[in-house]
Amino acid sequence: MAYEFASRLETFPNYRKFETTFAGRPFVVETGKMCGLSNGSAMIRYGETCVLCNVTMSDKPRDGVDFFPLSVEFEEKLYAAGRIPGSFMRREGRPGEHAILSSRVVDRPIRPLFPKDMRNDVCVTMTVMSQDPDCSAEISGMNGASLAIAMSDIPWNGPIAGVFVGLVDGEIVLNPTKEQREHSDLSLTLAASEEKIVMIEAGANEVDEETMMKAIRAGHEEIRKMLAFINSIVAEIGKPKKSFTPVELDHALLADVYANHLEDVKAAMNTDDKNVRDAAMLPIMDAIAAEHPELTAADLDLISYKLQKKVVRTWLLEDGKRVDGRGINEIRPLAAEVGLLPRVHGSGMFTRGQTQVLTICTLGSTKDAQLMDDLSDTPYKRYIHHYNFPPYSVGEARAPRSPGRREIGHGNLAERALIPVLPDQAEFPYTIRCVSEVLSSNGSTSQASSCGSTLALMDAGVPIKAPVAGISCGLITDGDPLHGGRWMTMLDIQGVEDFHGDMDFKVGGTRRGITAIQMDIKVDGLTYDIVEEALEKCRKGRLYILDEIIKPVIAEPRAELSKYAPKMFSMMIPVDKIKDVIGKGGKVIQEMCANFNCKIDIEEDGHVFISAVDQDDAKRAIATIKTIVEDPEIGAIYKGRVTRLMNFGAFVEIAPGKEGLVHISKLDDHRVEHVEDVVAVGDPIFVMVTDIDQQGRINLSRKDALAAIAKKRAEAAQQ
């Protein structure tokens, strides 16, 4: 029986391809071919980087939530770089640190542009399918996600676009190549709308504020070109936006609550103690719940938020007053301390108001560096910063959990702030890990972690180039600043100002300049004036902390490392001698590590790093390595070990992998009938190199070595 199959070729009638140039390279968008069931989808091709961007939204709002449920996922597939995952299952697992940080970078500029009263689940997914090291997958994903949302039927006030800005040899470079990034003094990820800056994420090598603003302006110009491209696509194939059911309180009910309880809330808020404020709000909310039994828990949370927000914002904009009584540019009380923990390598505690962070520094060998099994530019990290935020730091009674995205993001910000001032590996061949334990949190814990890291590193004796401090700046707006709306920035925001304000602008740096920036906003963007003012306020606050708080406590790194820290030494050996130091199957290097209680790391270029708790052990390992890589010299005396006995003499190992023969006639200064009468296998003996033949065989003499040693002792005795 013959079967007939209809031959049908899918031609994808909705397929469209759009092309432009982005920072000098081709940027291609393909739609209508993949992921037909998503609300919006686009394949982005930038150079040879390919990122598939999708956005989906639930049909109904999620019940019982008082927030907009947005999730942003940046998925790194190692096949994109032609690699197989190193896990046991050879499969990608949970998102790595780099993927989480990329997700946060995309989340922050798109989130403020969604309707705040929408409760439908929205999921944005960016899948890296091909990785070109010269074309950022992160920037491609950000622009692709913006396009996918803008052309979808999901309500959104975008688009935005992003660009990467570098500073190479003093020149601003847009979307620099991998080689340019390695030599850049600036790593700035910028997102913006047509008129405003929406997100800033930066690491910098002590770049001044003026140069930073030039980089921001240059990046914004390129972003405007990308926005024009995105808008042209949306105009052609964009879908009409869906309607949604907004979550809102009854206006009459809210007016009644304001009339009856706003003055009580003002009295409760007027304190610099977070616990007192929270406790004072409880009876007020209980009273509101009793007056309006129809309100749900989510409704009450929203009312509490609105009441506190109204008080905080009104006080700031109308009276220039802060809830804790500080001036607009006044920093909370500060304290710093080092050397708190006796057995750790370094420790520092930084306190700012009710925010307190204890940072511990640990030094390790190069083998302790973190291997990065992801698509980042860095194969491993020698400086690691971990940030822990336990529940007790905010007075919550629950069990701790593993680090989430917030902890990873805050840890990376403090890590990025310190990297520019770390010594080069050749100067200080240690792996460095700092752990910041948040003991109490009332805002700006990430910046307290930067300050705590500086204290801990200097306490550990790490020769950092300059101390680093961090501080944040907040913002309150009333209307659009571009069109006459009022706005005010304030220095060193605490938790309640962060929660109810419009911006958390965090800046870390030294006296010379900026080393890290992270900007979070809740409005649709910032003007240049706001960004410039925030940078200047953070500069002044940073200098105050460095000069008045950190310097009096510890002005420079300690001259010596902790006695509990491993002692690290480095040396160079010829590349062709690496195999001799390692030995067959690693035998030689393993024996040295065991005999001298040390760690030995050898790099491909011949750099050798030796670490040991006891300095003498490390020096003995260095001496042994030198004997391995150096050619034996005639007349040199070595302390060797007898390895074999023959009728005609004994073989002696003078260095791992190097043996020579002591003829029976050279064993002693008298006639020897039997070799075993003088030495046994395993005996340590002194020998002198007397000859090396053309085949590299080494002839040794115990008799000559003993005579030379006796002569030196006699000469020393006469002196």
Report residues per predicted region.
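Long, basic N-terminal domains or extensions that often function
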Residues: 2-245
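Conserved helix-loop functional segments at active or binding sites
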Residues: 108-116, 151, 340, 365-366, ...
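Flexible, glycine/charged-enriched surface loops at secondary-structure junctions
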Residues: 116-122, 157-159, 226-244, 275-276, ...
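Single-stranded RNA-binding regions, centering on S1/OB-family and related RNA-binding modules
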Residues: 564-568, 575-719
